[in-house]
Regions:
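Long, positively charged amphipathic alpha-helical accessory segments at protein N-termini or as interdomain linkers
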Residues: 11-13, 17-39, 50-185
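Conserved active-site carboxylates
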Residues: 47
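Structural signature of FAD isoalloxazine-binding scaffolds in flavoprotein oxidoreductases
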Residues: 1-7
Length: 185
């Protein structure tokens, strides 16, 4: 299922970072409803993992006072990609509820808009707590590829601004606000 929505959030642009986490939690809730007891985790900032595989990815793009949230969720089994960094999985592969792309998109849109409304009134703190409760890889060693360098460390939490906190080998802390995360070992 591919889904994009254009929004003009009723919050200052400096808080738009939280929409990425809100979108991940909204889709995680809908996938959880389809999968029952299959554990679902979120990977910073907005991927959703199930049974060791990526079931959903979300991207945001902001421009001209609006933000587009693009979401891709795997409903049917996917062809394995030998070059993919993360194995993929799907609702059907995991024995999930039979759902059409349109139904999943409708449910996700309703949940997303409701959560965005809550975020606009309550801020990032409750989003952060919920996201951390479903977070994959707490204290795992990871490498983050940034535009001009790579940093490595143990995932040490999520900042109040959505930044990924890495605890480096020398004991220092690195805050990452953008980058591609790769698990090590």
């Amino acid at each position: 299922m591919y889904f994009s929505i254009l929004l003009r959030p009723a919050i200052d642009k400096r808080y738009w970072f939280g929409l990425s986490f809100v979108a991940a939690l909204a889709m995680r809730a809908e996938l959880a409803a389809c999968l029952g007891n299959v554990p679902l985790q979120v990977k910073w900032p907005n991927d959703i993992l199930a049974d060791g595989g990526k079931i959903c990815g979300i991207l945001l793009e902001a421009r001209n006072g609006a933000v587009v949230i693009g979401t891709g969720a795997n409903i049917t089994p996917v062809v394995p990609l030998t070059l993919a960094k993360h194995p993929a999985t799907s609702l059907q592969s995991l024995g999930g509820e039979q759902v059409t792309p349109e139904d999943l998109a409708d449910r996700y849109a309703a949940g997303l808009l409701s959560r965005i409304s809550t975020y606009e009134t309550q801020g990032f703190a409750p989003v952060r707590l919920e996201w951390l409760s479903h977070c994959a890889h707490i204290d795992s060693m990871m490498r983050v590829s940034l535009p001009d360098m790579q940093v490595e460390g143990h995932f040490d939490g999520l900042g109040a601004d959505g930044a990924l906190h890495l605890r480096r080998a020398d004991g220092s802390r690195q805050e990452v606000t953008t980058g591609d995360v790769e698990l090590m070992g």
